[in-house]
Design a protein with these regions (language model features):
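Bacterial N-terminal signal peptides that target proteins for export
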Residues: 1-10
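A well-ordered secondary-structure block
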Residues: 98-187
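Bacterial N-terminal signal peptides
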Residues: 9-19
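Bacterial Sec signal peptide processing site at the extreme N-terminus
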Residues: 21-31
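Short, well-ordered surface patches within globular domains
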Residues: 29, 40-109, 168, 174-180, ...
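Short, low-complexity, Pro/Ser/Thr/Gly-rich segments in the mature regions of secreted, periplasmic
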Residues: 188-198
Length: 198
């Protein structure tokens, strides 16, 4: 049987142009308040990203993805690791990729493609800031951020994935049945989002 790993190599980074100082990430995850006082919780952003993903999939006549708590744990651990060690990539500084993280988390994914092949998982990443004034997408588009609430953060994350061909293909892959979303928020307001599929 052929194993096919879906690995979107181009990680999407929402770059913050105005009013955002470059700071090292905090070493612990925080719950952040934006300038207007809205509390941004990692779990609420994860839930809202999941809802937004399923809204978009429904628009494309695709089945919704079930929430998988174990896969969410794998995703959360990766987001927290990126925050803690100050990187943004599918592979950790030690070379661990999403399939190794699945294995370490005790998660096995085998989504049939045919009688002879299957997918073993997939991953999308996003890095954004809930106080950003301008977002620069991977495709070069610059748009006013204008988001303050967790729902607006979730919408911007999913919109960013939809404007990146590899991330879009992952998000709209009809074979996926479930996903886990993991979110970590740094003291500087940066938000790391990992989306893992099976």
């Amino acid at each position: 049987m052929t194993r096919i790993r879906v690995h979107t190599a181009i990680a999407i980074s929402f770059v913050f142009a105005l009013g955002c100082a470059a700071q090292a990430p905090a070493t612990t995850e925080v719950h952040s308040r934006n300038g207007g006082g809205t509390l941004v919780l990692p779990t609420s952003v994860a839930r809202l990203v999941h809802q937004e993903v399923n809204r978009v999939r429904a628009e494309h006549r695709l089945r919704p993805l079930a929430w998988d708590g174990r896969l969410g744990g794998v995703a959360t651990n990766h987001s927290r690791d990126m925050l803690r060690r100050g990187y943004f990539a599918h592979n950790s500084p030690t070379g661990e990729d999403f399939s190794a993280r699945y294995e370490r988390g005790g998660y096995t994914c085998q989504v049939p493609l045919s009688s002879r092949s299957f997918l073993t998982g997939g991953e999308n990443l996003a890095l954004t800031h809930h106080n950003a004034r301008i977002i620069v997408y991977a495709d070069g588009r610059k748009v006013p951020a204008g988001f303050r609430t967790p729902a607006q953060v979730a919408q911007r994350v999913v919109d960013g994935w939809l404007h990146s061909p590899g991330h879009r293909a992952n998000l709209l892959k009809p074979q996926w049945r479930q996903e886990g979303i993991g979110v970590a928020i740094g003291a500087d307001g940066r938000i790391w989002v990992t989306q893992n599929f099976c």
